[in-house]
Amino acid sequence: MKFLVSSDDTGVVKEVICNRGTDTSKQDATQPISVKNFCTEPNCSRKNRIIHMINYQEKYLVAIRIGGELSVYEIADDEYEIEDEYKYNLLHNYKLEVSSSDKPISLFTVDILEAVAVAFSSGKVFFVNFNDDKFDKEPVLVQLPGGKEIAEFSKNPSVEGIFGYGGEENDVRIVKLYESDITSEIFDTENVENNFKSEVVFTAKNVKNDHLDLRVPVWITKIRFFTEQPEKGYKFITATHYGQIRVYDTNHGRRPVRDFTVCQKPILTLTFANEEESEVIISDSHNLIAKHSLIQVDDKASKTHSASAGDIIKPVAKLLGRFVDQFGATYGVEVGEGLLVTGGLDRYLRVFDLASREIVAKVYVGVEVSSVVVLDYEEEESQEEIVGDVELLKKSEKRKRTLPVVEREESDEEDLWNQLEEKDIKRKKS
């Protein structure tokens, strides 16, 4: 397995190569094959550390740094063995026009534009097209309406041009930034910014006052759109600074159709746990990583007593289990191939089995982690196995030299077929 983790302490990226069963906290356990530093340019330090990274089309590692630097690094083809000095070379570094205090809050791919979108807490959103490796197009700036700071900006994966955002005392807004029939060709036009707009198509309404008739504070931290969207309107889920997850269907009004309190700390990450999107994984600012069902609800799970209102019973999204072992907040979360990959303040990269919640791999990386990227879930060949293969090859070559010419040719042909069969088996497995 191969992972990339951002280093908050130094601003670089660490590449971690390990197999199942790896555990650096135990001396007698399997150790990682490799843990190395990369992406040391441009002048990396804690001051310009990476906040978010993504794997762009298996070609680039794209990272947004504090201060507005968008760094694009090359992801080399795994089929070829490459020296470390040629790995993750810096291809281009964009300097986005933001203030030093303007924090990057999201980074993701926009396939229809062959671009990435970067959002900042000020409400500035930049669309960056790499123009077939030329990197000669200027980023396009779109300012989100509202005039308030935002803590989250997310795209609707099923409806082009639709995005959601929100923040502290800034409830969810769904906005249309471009038409659905747009293409990457707009970046070749003179006034490319004219192809973008900021049309608010939905504004959420706060939940009803609490049992004391007090207003419930608003602080959106995460938004995730469901893949299956209604014909009209939008369906999405939010997480809040106050430990709530809320499900919205805009066809049923501006308020959430479901409102659950799942923890007492700010929710930092919100990720769908399965293809059906019926389960979510959250992490909070303390040490919680938990999986909840969105369809199984414990109607009487939350019970509080009020002197004025008596017993107050609220439904809670059923807790399906917790992923334990971490200490401190978890910021980097990725789900895929039946695995959960995490990284955070306790300086460990962990890989969990989604079904059993058992630790599959645990690697101490020595740095605080803000973002995690998975490059490969497949098992890697260890150095010992490589050395063993080389020794076996040497013995085979030595044996061939002692054979007559005809037998040697037959042996070479047999080896060739064996190699082809091996590759075919590997392809089928993957």
UniProtKB/Swiss-Prot annotation:
InterPro entries on file: WD40/YVTN_repeat-like_dom_sf (IPR015943), WD40_repeat_dom_sf (IPR036322), WDR74/Nsa1 (IPR037379)
Places the protein is found: Nucleus, Nucleolus
GO cellular component: nucleolus; preribosome, large subunit precursor
SUPFAM superfamilies, per the entry: WD40 repeat-like (SSF50978)
One GO-annotated biological process of the protein: ribosomal large subunit biogenesis
Protein keywords: Nucleus, Ribosome biogenesis, rRNA processing
PANTHER family: NOP SEVEN ASSOCIATED PROTEIN 1, WD REPEAT-CONTAINING PROTEIN 74
Protein family membership: Belongs to the NSA1 family.
Role of this protein: Involved in the biogenesis of the 60S ribosomal subunit.
Subunit organization: Component of the pre-66S ribosomal particle.
Name the record gives this protein: Ribosome biogenesis protein NSA1
Source organism: Scheffersomyces stipitis (strain ATCC 58785 / CBS 6054 / NBRC 10063 / NRRL Y-11545)
Annotated gene: NSA1
